[in-house]
Amino acid sequence: MGLRSTTLVLAATSSLLGGLIFGYELGIISGALLMLKTVFQLTCFEQEALVSAVLFGALLASLIGGFIIDRSGRRTSIMGSNLVVLAGSIILIATSSFWWLVVGRVTVGFAISISSMACCIYVSEIVRPHQRGTLVSLYETGITVGILISYAMNYFLSAVNDGWKYMFGLAIIPAAFQFIVILFLPSKPHTLNFWEQDSDNGFIELEEAGESGEFKPDTYDKQYTFLDLFRSKDNMRTRTLLGLGLVLFQQFTGQPNVLYYASTIFRSVGFQSNSSAVLASVGLGVVKVASTLIAICFADKAGRRILLLAGCIVMTIAISGIGIVSFMVELDSHRDCGSIRSKNTSYGDSNASQLLGIIHAGTPTINTKDNLAHQLAMVIQSPSLSNSAGSKHTASMFPNSTVPPAGPDSNYAILNWITLLSMMAFVSAFSIGFGPMTWLVLSEIYPADIRGRAFAFCNSFNWAANLLITLTFLEVIGSIGLGWTFLLYGGVGLLAIAFIYFFIPETKGQSLEEIDQQLSSKRISKRRETSKGVRKRPSTGPPYQRVGKSNWT
């Protein structure tokens, strides 16, 4: 295996490990919280604070992480995030205080947010155009795999004394591996031939330069300030709006909340035992992984726009279908953080039910992207749904809804299965479209000098929108009902389809310099400009010239 092939494998491994850490940290809290609630006698507020800590850490990282990534370099930022994950994990393992648990989770959230941004940007800069979609999308695959691993660890460690410490501590392993892998990758990639198609097969030429190295090709000479993101210079304001549109539509189509009802839906269609419930949740996770792999295979063939459009169309149909069905079959929407462990429910039963609540990543997920604040901390009530107290509580919260029986009614069986299939379609569509493609496009559309800050700026809106959607979900349901809530998400999906179709340009097969040239024009074409000779546009500046290796030797 040559040097370039080795570097390619290492870049892919680093991207996959980065996503795995992100997904694992998002998913592991679901099982750990069950133990922590008992060990630390956590109140509802404390559970919410503990689960939301990762979100706030990630939001903080999004606000300042861009400056860190642009100033310190991508590779250094990734390595630093690994060390911060190590520090956060040690705090979580060693602590005997609730507030130190919160500090540990904030620390971990900060680290995985920095890593998610730096990984996507670094990999996009280090690989050739025809490999960029695949390699960057590997991060999303890592997220889904990380969540699946967290499912398994939650289940197998639930009966172990101090199992929550092992759950948190296991994150050190992939972080250590990524730290080692990144040591063998270049400090700062530089293109010597603009990734031309007729260059050597495989990997771009790299110059091993220091993190502060000044060598850059002509198209990398431009310097930007943060305020340039809101100015007309090189069409930066439009690029910023494109990035914000993607991350906001990703959240406002309802993906942080739709899977909150996974547990109810699974029970409705007959997944009521411990083993079948866990199997169902893992099965849905497997669907998510498989869908992400499909996105990887087609990102550099079908293109970003096609996958975004296809995914968003299916998501809109699926979420609207769930909304329509919910008018005919009333789903239980009660959740009570005090009932995470019912006195009538075994620990294993609670763990199985809890596992069903976190079946999504985004997001750089990175997911992220999960309904963390409520989906995990305020878990659905125990399987004993038909007790009078629970029914009375639910009736008071949702006067127009009814509590379904523990088992599926034969009259509603078909509708319940339609709901389940719609949810699986929603998960698959997100994993093909918004999940990986949003972060891939964000890593491509900004100039190198400001790419880290621009990515982080958009990512901060992603986390903020996630929190907003999560924290207002119950209030929206109480105001307009579950069915109309999901139909509202469907309406947002229609707007997202129009936004993608009319404004998002195709970037497949183009070098980052070619994409920058395309987006610098006042009018952004949504059609792909082929890399085999980018369509020439009238220009008042110096003509674009191909630079070969001979020019630099």
UniProtKB/Swiss-Prot annotation:
It is a multi-pass membrane protein. GO terms for molecular function: D-glucose transmembrane transporter activity. The gene is slc2a10. This is Solute carrier family 2, facilitated glucose transporter member 10. D-glucose binds at residues 250-251, 439. Residues 522-553 are annotated as: Disordered. InterPro entries: MFS_dom (IPR020846), MFS_sugar_transport-like (IPR005828), MFS_Sugar_Transporter (IPR050820), MFS_trans_sf (IPR036259), Sugar/inositol_transpt (IPR003663), Sugar_transporter_CS (IPR005829). Residues 1-15, 70-82, 127-132, 187-240, 299-305, 435-462, 505-553 are cytoplasmic. Facilitative glucose transporter required for the development of the cardiovascular system. It is found in: Endomembrane system; Cytoplasm, Perinuclear region. Keywords: Cytoplasm, Glycoprotein, Membrane, Sugar transport, Transmembrane, Transmembrane helix, Transport. It catalyses: D-glucose(out) = D-glucose(in). Glycans are attached at residues 274, 344, 351, 400. It comes from Xenopus laevis (African clawed frog). Belongs to the major facilitator superfamily. Sugar transporter (TC 2.A.1.1) family. Glucose transporter subfamily. Its main location: membrane. GO terms for cellular component: endomembrane system; membrane; perinuclear region of cytoplasm. SUPFAM superfamilies: MFS general substrate transporter. The chain crosses the membrane at residues 16-36, 49-69, 83-103, 106-126, 133-153, 166-186, 241-261, 278-298, 306-326, 414-434, 463-482, 484-504. One of its GO terms (biological process) is circulatory system development. Residues 37-48, 104-105, 154-165, 262-277, 327-413, 483 are extracellular. The keyword Zinc-finger does not apply. It comes from the Eukaryota. PANTHER family: D-XYLOSE-PROTON SYMPORTER-LIKE 2, SOLUTE CARRIER FAMILY 2, FACILITATED GLUCOSE TRANSPORTER MEMBER 10.
